[in-house]
Amino acid sequence: MKAQSIEDLMNQVSTANLQTSVAQLSGEQSATINGSTQTITSRVHSNNDLAADYIKERLETMPNLTVEFQNFNTTGKNVIATQLGQTNPDDIYIICAHYDSVTTYCADDNATGVAAVMEIARLLSNQCTDNTIVYALWDEEEIGLRGANYYAQQAADETNGNTRDNILGVINMDMIGYDGDAPGAAGDNDFDIDVRNIANSIAIKDDLISILNTYTFDLNEIVVNPGTTASDHSRFWNQGYSAVLVGESWETNDQTPDYHTSNDRVEDIDFQYMTELTKLVLAYTATKANLIAVDNTVIQTATDLTSNQATGTYQWINCDTNTPISGATNQSFTPSTNGNYAVEITNGGCTEISNCVNFSVLSNEEFQPNEIKVYPNPVKSIIKIDNFTESEIDITINTISGKVVKKTNSRKDYIEIEFDSTASGVYFVNIKSKTKASTYKIIKE
């Protein structure tokens, strides 16, 4: 996975994925479960093992997750997927939703929340984080918040030498798919943040609002304080943990009219609205878990490709065949043939892959100082090149990451290249003729 910004990840939230997951969880669409095509006809607590298997299997396809059932009575089982933090594994953020229902279908309550958790896990499991993320899907919410209650009690238990889990924040998504306007239509897009002044719950609310103001969303928050205790987040409040509920706006009476009935169907879900809420919780999670940056940029010269990540292990890849190159495991790589190349970098348990870089093999002979001169260095506005070779030369100027910013050719003995509008930084001027090639590092002030 390439290094991602939070905004990059938000833009990758897939409405189509959310639609498919909600349709499959609510039994409107079949899915492959336990190796065969099946339909989830029930998520009622007494008959929802197939739904649990579906969730667990989907999470198990994602990298960097440890997925398990947490059984808490003869029929109840939570699905817990843990993404261990690389720096602070004991600092935990939980993103959760209940997967059980009171009757058939129940698309909004709460296939929407489960689908959002799985979509966030799909995107963040490819990233490395400083802190631990737990993706939790609760059972038996509808008959007393039992699954979340068990987890929270176990996390807080300090008897018999146990250590209280350092859960820093919980976001519970319960019913995030209904907005009173026609699905996909412009409207108020109100949603509730239910919060109480327990532990640092108010700070979670503030962080969510900060994210709303930092990135672009089509959402309008309604802060409910004191918030409802009728969903799983409240069981974390009971144990003194920081938690909030994110969901459609009961506070403004803009919740599904089909609540707790089999009329709660996919056709009534506003997937644009649901996508926005999923993006919001993803951005919060990525921010608090703190994405670890592995530099996946590549420096390109006339003769070599070099990873800009100074530490780690490396594997160069032939992008044209999508295969690793045998023996190419150093920070720098000298291609022997023309082609497209990338490098996979692993550092501290985190793996990133660079963009593919097009490389043309050139002569190993370099220009002599009396043949080519590139100046001034540093440069402010004009790059000057003296060409004493009496040959045509190709000139390509790249950023440190390999991006081409200028490209030209000339056989003149004096060449000027406008550089005033180019951003400050380090650049490489690659000059080649039919028989020689050299790279010159310059600094733009």
State what each model feature region is.
Residues D181-A293:
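Active-site-adjacent substrate-binding region
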Residues Q300-Q309, I382-D386:
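A short beta-strand segment in extracellular, disulfide-stabilized domains
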Residues T20, G27-L84:
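A non-catalytic alpha/beta surface segment that caps or lines the substrate-entry region
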Residues T313-T321, T329, F333, T337-N340, ...:
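C-terminal outer-membrane/trafficking sorting elements
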Residues A31-I33, F72-T75, G85-N88, Y99-T104, ...:
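Solvent-exposed loop/turn segments at secondary-structure junctions
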Residues L9, L18-S26, V67-Q70, N78-T82, ...:
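Structural recognition of the beta-strand scaffold that forms the well-ordered cores
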Residues S101-N200:
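Acidic/histidine-rich catalytic neighborhood of metal-dependent amide-processing enzymes
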Residues K2-S46, D100, D254-R265:
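N-terminal capping segment at the start of a domain
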